[in-house]
Design a protein with these regions (language model features):
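Short, flexible helix-loop junctions that flank or precede catalytic/ligand sites
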Residues: 1-355
Length: 355
């Protein structure tokens, strides 16, 4: 048994989302969003190196030695998988382990609204799930892939860095590819995927122009492309994609996005006030004719208003989602205020909470 397992299993018993294993510091775990010490002794560099190197294969170790950082997956059989980032720092070496459930949660498990279920019924176009690191994007996407896997008879291909949730074939053929192991980059893997007769392609990160360009083209070709960006809100997401391209191509890209985009789900996780845990606040934008026109005309500053007016088709602004959680007693007004875009709308509930 690898030495790291004892620390990981201890963290899992606390329902931790992450384990921080860093030389020069005590071992810490993030529990319901709060980082807390779980072992008081300070990790030495020698101890940290021994334990972290033990779980690296040859390719991972060479990448780490050459680049001083590496992403990879680690699994304790029948317990959990972990996404790992190992790195060098001022005091030696460290690794952060993100716990991944052994099986993907379903949309029902996540209490997702019906509009998310509806998005999973599309067979072509682009669906984006966005948010900062640790906002639950991978969990949401895995649940959406699970729903498609059960409903479709086709080929689902995922490109990840590293592979997180391992999907078993149900109605679909599942191909999962890891950047750095099965392909040198997201762009290379996505370019290859276009020749592999996919029905659905999941792109773990749309982080560069080449990847974004191929993804947009694939969506136009009739493939359902699902991807993530580290953006906050639907308007910022569309803006990021369009502005990834040179100025002389942006008009054409706006037109392509206006027709191929199916929806954007932007999310963040907040600590719950009714019981220990965290809950997702979701901003949802569906590409209605009104939204499509705004994107095509470059009027992205008006998307927020259009989202607020689109409740009848399941759209919801982030502020609307936060206020709903406050009204249900799931999060405090103060917490919602801190995460809100228009903080003035939350002054009254913030004051009520503080009293």
């Amino acid at each position: 048994m690898a030495q790291i397992n004892q620390y990981l299993e201890e963290a899992l018993k606390l329902n931790a989302s992450d384990l921080h294993f860093v030389s020069g510091d005590p071992v810490r775990a993030r529990v319901h969003g709060i980082l807390r010490v779980i072992r008081k002794e300070t990790l030495t560099t020698d101890m940290a190196e021994q334990i972290i190197y033990e779980i690296m294969d040859g390719i991972t170790r060479r990448t780490f030695d050459n680049e001083d950082a590496v992403d990879f997956a680690y699994e304790i059989p029948d317990v959990s998988r972990f996404r790992v980032n190992a790195f060098r720092h001022l005091n030696g070496i460290g690794a952060i382990f993100r716990a991944i459930p052994s099986t993907a949660l379903t949309l029902v498990d996540l209490n997702m609204p019906s509009v998310i279920h509806d998005l999973c019924k599309y067979t072509q176009g682009m669906i984006l799930v966005t948010g900062k690191t640790g906002s639950g994007k991978s969990t949401t996407l895995a649940a959406m892939i699970d729903a498609m896997n059960k409903r479709l008879k086709g080929h689902i291909l995922t490109i990840e860095d590293p592979i997180e949730f391992v999907h078993k074939a149900q109605g679909c053929l599942i191909s999962q590819r890891e950047v750095g192991v099965h392909s040198p980059s997201f762009a290379e893997a996505l370019h290859s995927a276009m020749r592999e007769d996919p029905d659905v392609v999941l792109v773990g990160e749309m982080r560069d122009l080449e990847t974004i360009s191929i993804a947009v083209t694939a969506a136009e070709m009739g493939i359902l492309v699902m991807g993530t960006l580290h953006t906050n809100g639907a308007a910022q997401t569309v803006d990021r994609i369009i502005n990834s391209f040179p100025a002389d191509k942006q008009s054409h890209i706006r037109t392509m996005i206006s027709t191929s985009l199916r929806g954007v789900v932007s999310q963040q996780l907040l600590p719950t006030s009714d019981k220990p845990g965290r809950v997702a606040a979701l901003e949802i934008m569906i590409n209605t004719p009104a939204i499509s026109n705004l994107i095509r005309q470059g009027k992205l500053d008006q998307l927020e208003t259009a989202i607020q007016s689109g409740g009848n088709v399941g759209m919801k602004s982030m502020d609307g989602a936060l206020m709903e959680l406050v009204n249900k007693g799931r999060v405090t007004g103060q917490e919602a205020y801190q995460q809100a875009n228009n903080k003035a709308k939350f002054e009254s509930v913030r004051e009520t909470t503080e009293e």
